[in-house]
Every structure is written in C-alpha cells, then in structure tokens.
Amino acid sequence: MADRILTPPLPDYLGPHQPGITDPVWPAKAPTGFDQAKYGALYAGQLERQRHLHVITADVASRTREELAGLLWTLTGFARHQMAKVPPSDTQRPYDEPVVTRRVTVTVGFGATLFTTIAGDDRFNLAARRPASLKVMPQIDGDDGFRPRDHATDLVILVSSDDYYVNEYIFGRLYYGGVHPGIRVRSVERGYARPDSREPSGFEDGITNPRDASGPSSMHDFVYIRAEDGEPEWCIGGTYLAYRKIRRRMKHFFELPAQDQEAVFGVDKKTGVRLEPHQAHAHAAKINPRRPNHRDLFDMDDLERRFLRRPYFFDDGLDADGEELRGLHHLSFARNLGVQYEWPVLMWQTNPDFPVKGTGQDALYGPGGAANIGGGYYFMPAAANDADHLGTGLGLKREHGGIDDAVQV
C-alpha cells in the first residue's frame, strides 16, 4: 500500500434515506495507489461510523395535528441545518490541521406512542398510518430492571459526529427548547466508537455485518423497506430501529482465561472467525447461527434474517455498588422488525431450546454477564425532500415559507 492515509467517507446527505443509517460507508473500490485486496478485506463497503453518538429520546407536547406538523417541520429544518454547517475556520489555531468536516448526521425516528399512546389514545389521528411492525418494545429475558413500556417515547433523535462537543451543542438546543418548545426530551445516552473494529471486551466485531461492496446494495436490501413489503406507502425507503443499551459486567469476564472468553463468544478473539466445534450456547451460535442447507418453517435461510448493526460503547462510571457501568449501545436497523430482529432475539437468542433442546441461555447473558438496561423500537422514515418535512408522509401538512430562523444557529 502506498504511504498514504485514507480520508474517512462522508455521510450521504443527498440520498433518498436519512443520513446516519447506512452511511458513512467506504466505497467498494480502493482509491488509486492502495492495495485493492487489503482495502477490499478491511474497508470496502463497510460502515465507517462517526466517533461519537448521542441517543436522544423525546415526547411531543403538541395538542393538534397542525401543531405536530409545525414541530416536525422545524425539527427537519434544524437537522438539515446542523448537517450542512461547515466548521468555522476562525476558531482553529494557526498550526492545527484544518477541520473540513465533522461528518454530522441527525437521524429522526418515530416511536409507537406517536401513533397511539400507551393508554390507547389516537391523539393525532395517526393510528391508521402506523408502520406494520412498530410497537412498544416487549420485555425479554435479559432485561435487568428495565421495563420498555415505561421508557417508550414519541421520538428518537440520533446525533452522530466526529466531535463530541458538536453532539453536545445539538443536544443542548433540543433539551433547552431552542429548536421547538413542543419537544420534551426524556433521556440522552452518550456513546463512542473505538478506532478499530473491536467490541468492549476486545473481540473482533462486525465481520458478518452487511456491506455495500458489490452489485445491488446488499446493505440496503437488508435495511430499507420496499413497495412489496406490505407497509403503508409512506414507509417505503424507511427502516426500523431496534435500540438496546446492553450493560457488560466486564470484571467477571476478564477474570476468565482467554480460552473460556472465546467459548462464551464462540469465536476467535483476534480474528473473529468462528470456533469449530463451538458450544451450542455460545453467543455466535445463539444470535447468529450459520446452519448449512437449513431452511426454517418459513423457508428462510439463517443469512436472510441478518440486520445492520451500528454499535457504540458507553462508560457511565460506577453504579451505587461501586461496579463499573459500561457496555454497548446496540443500534440495529432492519427492513422487517419481526423477521430480521425479533426472530433472532426471541426464537434463537433467548430460546433455551435453541439450537437444540436444553441448550440454555446465551452464554454472554449468563450469571455476571450482560444485561439489557435500556432501549426501544422506532421507525426511521425516508429522507424528506426540500419542500417537505419528515412527517409529510403521515399527512401532516404545514403551510410554510422558509426554514424558521430559530433553527439556523
């Protein structure tokens, strides 16, 4: 390889989908002067996440459809403006490397309660337009004091960039009502991406993630809804987000010998290659099986149930017992929430009789292992064109001129 450094890919701000889902992504072909084989193995078609993530959940205080339309119009304009901003040159020191872009993405999703409240109220007359698979996240084995129903929200806003303080600024504008007074922030979670492709305990991660490497976009095939998927028409080009905040109790795990750590995951720690033979309750075998020549009751191969993972790590210090509070923000994007996400989680991972009767729980979630402590289901609509907002497909029309001055900061 030439003595050069690759410039990270930029988000896709002009495509039909919201930025921050299947982008930024490395091009399939290596730039001139780079070894195509090495590039193909390590970069081609892979997500190149920004360094920092804020997961912001919020409810809407709007009382009418008109007010909700105004809120979504303003939020859409705010997101566009933040993504289009160029880093100011007058704040950089004269001998620092110029910052050309911070690769900001602001990605908005709708929760089930926007369509029907927990109490069953169709407050905005949107129930008939609810995406087919969207619901409040169900309780599952592995939830540790987390009741998804109590944490269901109307909106999720994913803010990603290479600058932590940019994320904080955007969060502050939303939290303090500077974007729209009807946005009531419920929570914020902060995450970071490792510069390599390893997860918190040091294992190679993401080897089986769909790529954009060749031909029709395989990543998009797994992620974005099509006309034949039986969804409301406005959902075409959108995707589902299954978000879980997963706590990892690392002290116990790191006390295990390396061989036992690998047995928990079912893969080689350095390479990520699956161990053969592996234990039936190993994490890889439970959530990501690869059974040759196997088709299930719905005539689907295991590989057809994949989803796109976009993980970030968190480190929230120590809990009340003095134990470190760290783990993974597990963001999963899928075209069909039931087929691609709930089936692997409910029928495989948490099923004590998968892959064979008496297997037990996923080894990663064993005593002193992992636990779900947050999350939710959301629908991420397609990108809005310049004349519309993210709620236009819901029939929420708003008479407007330009972008509100309040969002242009």
Walk through the language-model features, giving the residues of each:
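Long, histidine/aromatic-enriched segments associated with O2/redox biology
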Residues: 2-409
